[in-house]
Amino acid sequence: MIKSCVIGLSKNSQIYCNNLKKIKITSLNFVYDKDQTLRNNAAKKFKCQTSNNFEEILRNKEIELFIIASPTTTHEYYLNKLIQYKKIIYCEKPISLNASKLNSLVKRIKSKKIKICIGLNRRFSDAYIKMKKLIKNKKVKIIQITSRSSNADVTQSVRNGGLFMDKGFHFFDLACWFANSLPKKIITIANPLSTKEFLKNNDYSDAVVNMKFKNNIIVEYIFSRNNILGHEEKIKLFGNKFKIDSDKFFKKSIIYKNFDIKHKDSYLKCLEKFVYLNKSLLLNEGIRTQRICDEVLRSARIN
């Protein structure tokens, strides 16, 4: 049995607490959050332990697996601690907000042979797996990705790395996955589309991103935090005489639901695959996607 701890206890983060209890070879033994009320309530809810001292949990040799589901600004801190103690790590995207420190972090992870997974769970969504299978013998020419939500909280967006690192990350990864390729040209338009509130915080509320991939597939992304319908997530794949629309693979009742409902199955499947592996999962993909995010942001600042 792999004894585990979840770091960060927001509503969405608690999905991991439930999933650790569902997987046959894992158990939830500790939860941790800097917020005393959150950690005490979660410990009571999930019938596990907690502590006001994170180092105390780290020093417990029985706790092998740590899930980092805390705010993005804290990922680097917890990663460094967990690498030091040679723990197994499941980290929500992104790895770090500091591009200059990404290489050194990854170098430490690999040199110490840390088993780690970056939570690119959208790849494990039933709908997207079905779409991926449908294009196995087809040539995709254009991919259109839309992600629009009603979350206009500037503080939360900045804390999570901004529009592209927070909202775009999963979709940049999915585009590479569907295209079986990497982008070679990126053009981002965000300044003229975004609200003043976001711009004055060096962030964007809306953006259009166009990419040309190395295999000549064109990908168009539309991102927005101002959608009154709720969470709108659509992926369309176009080729000669075919179009595959993600809406056809979701129940109508959940099309505009939040991602934790629409892709609930994917969280469990990604974590489950990782714990049964004897090696890291999606680390290189996470590194690559983080660098794509940086390029998208660079393009936004000059256009």
Region roles according to the model:
Residues 1-45:
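N-terminal Rossmann-like dinucleotide-binding module
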Residues 7, 65-70, 214, 272-303:
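C-terminal helix-rich "cap/oligomerization" subdomain common to oxidoreductases
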Residues 16, 46-108:
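Beta-loop-alpha module in the N-terminal Rossmann-like domain of NAD(P)-dependent dehydrogenases
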Residues 29, 62-64, 141:
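Conserved acidic residues
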Residues 52, 91, 116-118, 246:
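Hydrophobic residues in well-ordered beta-strands that form the structural core
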Residues 73, 96-154:
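A contiguous active-site-proximal alpha/beta segment in oxidoreductase catalytic domains
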Residues 154-218, 224-229, 284:
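Rossmann-like dinucleotide-binding domain that binds NAD(P)(H)
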Residues 199-204, 215-272, 282:
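NAD(P)-dinucleotide binding in Rossmann-like oxidoreductases
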